[in-house]
């Protein structure tokens, strides 16, 4: 049975953030965990499926491979093993889920301190030629960078931030509500764990400023629409000295004047005259490497495909290049003179009593049989 899409398994969109991905997995894992569904084979299978999906999507490299190549991109890279032990007991999941809310369910974690910057996405439009051959391009990306004036601290040069007196630097405080000790974001430092009495006049205490960066992107040969190129560390700068996020360049290949691409093969239509179709001849057809000659045999019908081997696309992961398939389209002459029409009438008379249109003859016979079957 074919595997379900991993994003569908966890009920998330393809651009889901790491945090929302984790929340979605916890929700599914808690619902179908074997500890909550003893002797339920269906629930156990769904738990295994969710664990496998989360293992791939929570790993940046595996997720990038899956986004680009689907299940084939992550085959043979291990897995959770399919058992409940792949994540841990239900109590582990429960404690991890509610540890951020209830102080006693896992100790809680402060939110102050360095945090990773957000990932960014950029859509890159490419010509078919550049996508097939590979290229290097410059792109401009608006982002957040560490403030050079304060070194990312947010404090005015010569001063420093101080530990928040309310939360003690944890970024969160606990409040007693009935039987539970509820953990909330510190209202004084807003979760940062520190306060700045004299903020930087450039970043106004944020530690980061907006900037447009110019980046060089090396596009490998063979990319296609939907492929992604990851530039590690080129996303937004992290807060409080945290690591930068990544930039994902999404490839979009523009329509081409002559060619359509399907996988590693290219297709094009080649118009030919009725005379070349009848008598045969040599035609020049375009390829991505220049013009080549195509020999058209006599009595060629419109729509016939001719294959030029090796004139397609070399796959991004290597292997033999695909083919160029040329579909000939026989054109009917237009703007005929009286003399030309007269000559065609004479030619038409020479065809009487003989069969020169096999498809037309079989079509008429089929129509005759069709209407014959409809007799009342």
Swiss-Prot record:
* Gene3D superfamilies cross-referenced by the UniProt entry: DnaJ domain, Heat shock protein DnaJ, cysteine-rich domain, Urease metallochaperone UreE, N-terminal domain
Could you say which residues bind Zn(2+) 1 here? Answer: 147, 150, 200, 203
| ZnF bounds (CR-type) | 134-212
Database matches in PROSITE patterns: DNAJ_1, DNAJ_2, ZF_CR
Cofactor entry: Zn(2+)
Under Gene Ontology molecular function, one entry of this record is: ATP binding
Give the residues the record marks as binding Zn(2+) 2. Answer: 164, 167, 186, 189
The protein in question is named Chaperone protein DnaJ
Originating species: Teredinibacter turnerae (strain ATCC 39867 / T7901)
């Amino acid at each position: 049975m074919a595997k379900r899409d991993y994003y569908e398994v966890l009920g998330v969109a393809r651009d889901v953030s790491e945090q929302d991905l984790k929340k979605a997995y916890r929700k599914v894992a808690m619902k179908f965990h074997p500890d909550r569904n003893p002797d339920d084979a269906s629930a156990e299978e769904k738990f295994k499926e969710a664990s496998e999906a989360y293992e791939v999507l929570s790993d940046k490299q595996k997720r990038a491979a899956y986004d680009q190549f689907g299940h084939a991109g992550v085959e043979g890279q291990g897995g959770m093993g399919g058992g409940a032990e792949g994540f841990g007991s239900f109590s582990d999941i429960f404690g991890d889920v509610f540890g951020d809310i209830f102080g006693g369910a896992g100790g809680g974690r402060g939110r102050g301190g360095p945090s990773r910057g957000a990932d960014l996405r950029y859509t890159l439009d490419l010509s078919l030629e550049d996508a097939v051959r590979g290229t290097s391009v410059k792109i401009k990306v608006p982002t957040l960078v560490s403030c050079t004036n304060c070194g990312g601290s947010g404090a005015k040069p010569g001063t420093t931030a101080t530990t928040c007196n309310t939360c003690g630097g944890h970024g969160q405080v606990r409040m007693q509500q009935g039987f539970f000790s509820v953990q909330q974001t510190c209202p004084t430092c807003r979760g940062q764990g520190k306060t700045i009495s004299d903020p930087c006049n450039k970043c106004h205490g944020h530690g980061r400023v907006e900037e447009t960066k110019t980046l060089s992107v090396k596009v490998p040969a063979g990319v296609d629409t939907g492929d992604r190129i990851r530039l590690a560390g080129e996303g937004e700068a992290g807060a409080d000295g945290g690591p930068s996020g990544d930039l994902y360049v999404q490839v979009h290949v523009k329509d081409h004047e002559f060619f359509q691409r399907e996988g590693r093969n290219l297709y094009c239509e080649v118009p030919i005259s009725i005379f070349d179709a009848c008598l045969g001849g040599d035609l020049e057809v375009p390829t991505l490497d220049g013009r080549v000659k195509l020999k058209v045999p006599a009595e060629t019908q419109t729509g016939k495909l001719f294959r030029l081997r090796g004139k397609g696309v070399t796959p991004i992961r290597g292997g033999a290049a695909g083919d160029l398939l040329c579909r000939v389209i026989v054109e009917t002459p237009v703007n005929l003179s009286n003399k030309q029409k007269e000559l065609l009438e004479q030619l038409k008379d020479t065809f009487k009593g003989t069969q020169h249109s096999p498809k037309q003859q079989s079509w008429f016979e089929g129509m005759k049989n069709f209407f014959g079957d409809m007799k009342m």
